[in-house]
């Protein structure tokens, strides 16, 4: 069991040699799984120039009671500090046949959780996931190629000299009789809820494959983020969000408010610059009305979004976005001369 509070890790290559984690009955209701269970706290953790490789299997099929699992190759939870120039090549698989888990799974970090005005989390340089994530099955999840869930009540810095990339595939099978919960799947981040902030240079090349098993669950799926929304009525300023991976949905999307976007599934309170999609959305069964080339569905609470003309869906099979709640939301000309880290 490794818990990191005040630490610095740098210039290392660590290989996971077939790590297998078995979750059985215990008094615990929350499990953190990764090289470190948890990093950061009152003191910051700093991770620099680290490469993780190998594979990790998480087996929860013997567990009988409901539980939460936060899992990533680096850490189950990251709360305070900096991740700079880190790459994961770890393939992660998870199995929970009973559908009793609330899962936060990311290629690097399961749950990035920033609380308090003195708490800062920064991503710097190249932060990359190249490992594949396989979930079979699950029923309540936040799954992202790099970060499963990011919740920011403190300060999160993902801007300027940074590029957060996912190059691994996400393959998810839902439990056939799962409850109709909301779940979030994104090529880079599953769910991102944040204070007012800039978010820059998030790129996805991995494919997302979901088998819904014809459940009534509500899915928020995006090539980059499953959902990107602010707390309360603050604003987000995303720049250079890019997706080249396909989103493939097998079986029906039965929930009325599922949202599928080439870049972001559910969105709100944002001014979008350089949002670009080159990946296809392939739905083999019954679709839903909120499928869009760039942005799936506008949040009924966090509206008033601006989509600037520098945003492009290069596939063109669907409308660029679905907006229906907020009259101020609109597409507007872009007068900026943007720099970009996009390949």
PLM segments and residue spans:
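Function-dense linear segments that define catalytic or interfacial modules
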Residues: 49-50, 55
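Consensus "Asn ladder" position of solenoid repeat domains
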Residues: 50, 86, 161, 166, ...
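Ankyrin repeat domain, specifically the short helix-to-loop turn at the C-terminus of the second helix
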Residues: 54, 89-90, 130, 164, ...
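Extracellular beta-strand/beta-solenoid scaffold signature
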Residues: 5, 22-39, 60-77, 96-122, ...
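Short, small-residue-biased leader/transition segments that mark boundaries at the very start
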Residues: 1-9
């Amino acid at each position: 069991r490794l818990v990191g509070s005040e630490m610095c890790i740098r210039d290392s290559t660590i290989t996971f040699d077939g790590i297998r984690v078995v979750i059985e009955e215990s008094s615990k209701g929350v499990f953190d799984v990764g090289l470190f269970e948890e990093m950061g706290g009152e003191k910051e953790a700093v991770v620099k120039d680290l490469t993780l490789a190998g594979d990790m299997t998480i087996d929860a099929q013997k567990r009988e009671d409901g539980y939460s699992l936060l899992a990533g190759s680096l850490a189950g939870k990251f709360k305070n500090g900096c991740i700079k120039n880190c790459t994961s090549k770890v393939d992660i698989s998870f199995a929970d046949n009973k559908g009793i888990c609330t899962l936060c799974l990311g290629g690097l970090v399961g749950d990035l959780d920033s609380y308090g005005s003195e708490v800062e989390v920064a991503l710097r340089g190249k932060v990359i996931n190249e490992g594949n994530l396989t979930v079979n099955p699950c029923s309540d999840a936040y799954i992202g190629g790099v970060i499963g869930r990011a919740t920011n009540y403190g300060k999160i810095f993902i801007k300027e000299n940074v590029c957060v990339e996912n190059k691994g595939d996400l393959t998810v099978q839902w439990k056939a009789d799962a409850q109709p919960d909301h779940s979030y799947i994104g090529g880079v981040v599953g769910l991102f809820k944040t204070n007012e902030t800039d978010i820059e240079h998030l790129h996805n090349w991995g494919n997302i494959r979901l088998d819904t098993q014809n459940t009534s669950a509500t899915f928020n799926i995006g090539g980059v983020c499953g959902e990107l929304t602010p707390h309360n009525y603050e604003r987000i300023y995303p720049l250079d969000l890019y997706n080249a991976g396909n989103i493939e949905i097998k079986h029906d999307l039965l929930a009325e408010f599922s949202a599928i976007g080439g870049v972001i599934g559910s969105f709100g309170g944002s001014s979008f610059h350089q949002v670009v999609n080159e990946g296809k959305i392939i739905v083999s069964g019954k679709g839903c009305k909120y499928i869009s080339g760039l942005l799936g569905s506008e949040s009924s609470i966090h509206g008033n979004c601006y989509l600037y003309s520098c945003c492009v869906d290069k596939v063109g099979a669907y409308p660029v976005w679905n907006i229906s709640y907020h009259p101020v939301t609109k597409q507007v000309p872009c007068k900026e001369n943007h720099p970009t880290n996009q390949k």
